[in-house]
Structures are given as C-alpha cells and as structure tokens.
From Swiss-Prot:
Native species: Exiguobacterium sibiricum (strain DSM 17290 / CCUG 55495 / CIP 109462 / JCM 13490 / 255-15)
NCBIfam families with a match to the protein in the record: rplB_bact
Gene designation per UniProt: rplB
Keywords: Ribonucleoprotein, Ribosomal protein, RNA-binding, rRNA-binding
A molecular function (GO) term: rRNA binding
Domain of life: Bacteria
Protein name: Large ribosomal subunit protein uL2
C-alpha cells in the first residue's frame, strides 16, 4: 500500500500521513470469524494497571486468525484482503475447497484469487505454510512456531521477516528480524514470505487525537509526577533526578539495563544475540 499525504488545512493535518488502503478489498469482516472484544484499559483481573498508555479508542471486533495453519493438503483461495484494527499487518480471508473459511496474516505479494496450502506437500510459494524441515535454506519466512502445533508466535508484525539460515539435526537455524540467530525445532511450522503492509512504520500520526482513536494514552514524564508516582518526581520546579542515574517507574535502572533473566532455559537455543 502507498502513503497518502494530507493538505495542511489544520495544524494537526500538516504532516499527517495515512495508508491509502489500495490493497484492501473488503470493508466488513467475515461475521463467523469475529468475536466481541472488551476494553481492559491496561488493567489485569485485580484492576491494577499492568500495561501503561492503554485505554479508550474506537470500538473493535476481534478477528480470529489461523496462526496454526494446520489445515493440511486442502487448497484454499484468497477471497479478500482486509484491514485488521488489532494488528499492524493486513489479513486475508481464505475460502477452502471443503467450505471452511479462515483468516491468515497477509504476506507481501499475496493477491485475491491466489491459492494457498499448508502441510509437507505444499509448494514453496508465498502464503504456504510448511514445517521448517521442508523449507529450503535462504527462504524468507514469517509466523514461526516455537513449539510444534502451538501456532506461530514470532515474526507477525507488518513488514517483518526472518530467514532460514540452515539445518542442524532436528533443529533449524533462523535469523530473526531483530538480528538474533536462534535454533528452532525443525518440526515447527512457518509461512513462506514476508509479512505485508511494510509501509506501516512510515505513517505519521500527525496529532494527539489520532493516537487516542487507536487506544493509546499519553506518556507522562516522571519528572513532572509526584514522588509517590515516580522516582524522578517531586522537588520544587524543574528539579534534577536526585539519584545516581535515571530509573523506571518501578525503581529499576533505565536506559541500557539488561532485564532478561540470567540462565534462562531458552538461552541454549540462541546462537547469536540481536544487534543493538
């Protein structure tokens, strides 16, 4: 999709950009594949804030996405490419020849009326899902499983892709979008191609209100809070931090402090750390 610019009719629209939705072919989702989505406002079941900067926004319906891609050996036709408000990537509605309908992530290059398939017999073609053991080395992939049958967990955002670098026994070696290289069981599935809608990161929101439409609340600086709310808070006027270095709202060192658990069980699968 291309980027649409707006005329500077107001200050908010002066540098605003949006996607032109040229690839979108349907305005309403498949009713049988949607669910009610209630707002949580970033709170957990105790009512406590666990994710900051969430709340409000336009009402949404959740689209049920097939991340498992386990409908083996049955061809499906791409019926529509649709917008999904719950993720950065677009989604594609697949009509299988046995009558079932499913949503999948829309990879780059996928068009209406193209065919997709899952399973070991599927061709190496954009949108097809196979075990890593059946995918040639060097192929770009997305929607990668970490446990066989659990469904894709890695590389699902717009414009992202991973590359299959090699195979070593029962493991496949994959370079992820972050630059990290890790081993994944070769029986895990992945989908061929890169995730579409790669211009998503180029969109300029333009004004605060548009962020609120998306359910994003403001990010407030710690230095303008009270001491009860943030380690940087309090003091008279624009006071310095008063500590040896900047801290998170929970008192942990900020800016470069490593938060990954030491001796994590999955460390042995990481061949090379991500680039900083």
């Amino acid at each position: 999709m291309g980027i649409k610019k707006f005329k500077p009719t107001t200050n908010g629209r002066r540098n605003m950009t949006a996607l032109d939705f040229a690839e979108i072919t349907a305005s309403r989702p498949e009713k049988s594949l949607t669910e009610k989505l209630s707002k949580k406002g970033g709170r957990n079941n105790q009512g406590r804030l666990t994710v900051r900067h969430q709340g409000g926004g336009h009402k949404r319906k959740y689209r049920i996405i097939d991340f498992k891609r386990n409908k083996d050996g049955i061809a499906g036709r791409i019926a529509t490419i649709e917008y999904d408000p719950n993720r950065s990537a677009n989604i594609a509605l697949v009509h299988y020849i046995d009558g079932e309908k499913r949503y999948i992530l829309a990879p780059k290059g996928l068009k209406v009326d193209m065919q997709v398939m899952s399973g070991v017999e599927a061709d190496i073609k954009v949108g097809n899902a196979l075990p890593l053991s059946n995918i040639p080395v060097g192929t770009l992939i997305h929607n990668i499983e970490l446990k066989p049958g659990k469904g894709g967990q890695l590389v699902r955002s717009a414009g992202t892709s991973a590359q299959l670098l090699g195979k070593d026994g029962k493991y496949a070696i994959v370079r992820l979008q972050s630059g990290e290289t890790r081993m994944i069981l070769a029986t895990c599935r992945a989908t061929v191609g890169a995730v579409g809608n790669e211009e998503h990161e180029l969109v300029n929101i333009g004004k605060a209100g548009r962020s609120r439409w998306l359910g994003k609340r403001p990010t407030v600086r710690g230095s303008v809070m009270n001491p009860v709310d943030h380690p940087h808070g309090g003091g008279e006027g624009r006071a310095p931090i008063g500590r040896s270095g900047p801290l998170t709202p929970w008192g942990k060192p900020a800016l470069g402090y490593k938060t990954r658990k030491k001796n994590k069980a999955s460390d042995k699968y990481i061949v090379r750390r991500s680039k900083k």
